């Protein structure tokens, strides 16, 4: 494969917040490199060679969480599903550091972590290689002029659809009603079908759900979580 031209990608949002604790810096120094899913960045993989997911996870089915926040859900799923390999993508380094601490405490070994833009990761995921994907409480970008920054746009949904296997599940959780509107409007345009027949299908959490700190904040502030399930057609 010849070297590809790197696309221009705007990145919006924070990469780093308040100062990291000494332990968090140590986790990043000692653990992050070993949890890499492989060559994702353009500098190390300009040809955009696909990742070797069977080699990474010993042939296990692979799940993907896009924007894992503090990592509660990611570690929970890894602990509950040891026969699944899970990749988490998160550009916010404070969230990555929080996740690494949780991984140490939980002792899970079926995780890989991309500390960067999910678009770069999706570039190098093999076609039809992912069995399940999660988008949980993504940045809502509430201003109308910023809605194009949301994940549920063609720029993100097309590469996600390419990476997901037919019949695989895509879960979206959000407490923002307009994000629900845009999700239901845009996701079905890109090869997905919404699995809902009645209101309880999106009001009720999934059976294996763990409530995250983002969800708890939404509940305290009086917002209603929505749990949307799609299948890749």
Curated annotation (Swiss-Prot):
Chain sites annotated for binding S-adenosyl-L-methionine: 65, 90, 117, 139
Protein name: tRNA (guanine-N(7)-)-methyltransferase
Family: Belongs to the class I-like SAM-binding methyltransferase superfamily. TrmB family.
Positions that bind substrate: 143, 175, 212-215
Catalytic reaction equation(s): guanosine(46) in tRNA + S-adenosyl-L-methionine = N(7)-methylguanosine(46) in tRNA + S-adenosyl-L-homocysteine
GO MF entries: tRNA (guanine(46)-N7)-methyltransferase activity
Entry's EC annotation: 2.1.1.33
Pathway where this protein functions: tRNA modification; N(7)-methylguanine-tRNA biosynthesis
UniProt-annotated catalytic positions: 139
Record's function text: Catalyzes the formation of N(7)-methylguanine at position 46 (m7G46) in tRNA.
One Gene Ontology cellular component annotation held by this UniProt entry: tRNA methyltransferase complex
Keyword set, alphabetical order: Methyltransferase, S-adenosyl-L-methionine, Transferase, tRNA processing
């Amino acid at each position: 494969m010849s070297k590809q031209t790197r696309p221009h990608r705007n990145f919006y949002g924070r990469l780093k917040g308040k100062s990291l604790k000494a332990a968090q810096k140590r986790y990043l120094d000692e653990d992050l490199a070993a949890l890499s899913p492989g060559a994702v960045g353009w500098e190390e993989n300009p040809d955009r060679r696909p990742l070797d997911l069977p080699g990474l996870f010993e042939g296990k089915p692979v799940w993907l969480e896009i924007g894992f926040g503090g990592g509660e859900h990611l570690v929970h799923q890894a602990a509950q599903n040891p026969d699944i390999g899970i990749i988490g993508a998160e550009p916010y380094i404070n969230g990555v550091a929080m996740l690494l601490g949780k991984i140490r405490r939980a002792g899970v070994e079926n995780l890989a972590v991309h500390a960067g833009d999910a678009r770069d990761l999706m570039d190098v995921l093999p076609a039809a290689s992912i069995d399940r994907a999660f988008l949980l409480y993504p940045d809502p970008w509430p201003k109308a002029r910023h809605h194009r920054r949301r994940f549920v746009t063609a720029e993100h949904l097309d590469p996600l659809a390419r990476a997901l296997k037919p019949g695989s599940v895509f879960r979206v959780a959000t407490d923002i009603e307009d994000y629900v509107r845009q999700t239901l409007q845009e996701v079905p345009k890109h090869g997905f079908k919404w699995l809902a027949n009645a209101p309880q299908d999106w009001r009720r959490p999934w059976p294996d759900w763990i409530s995250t700190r983002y969800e708890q904040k939404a509940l305290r502030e009086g917002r209603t979580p929505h749990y949307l399930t799609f299948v890749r057609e």
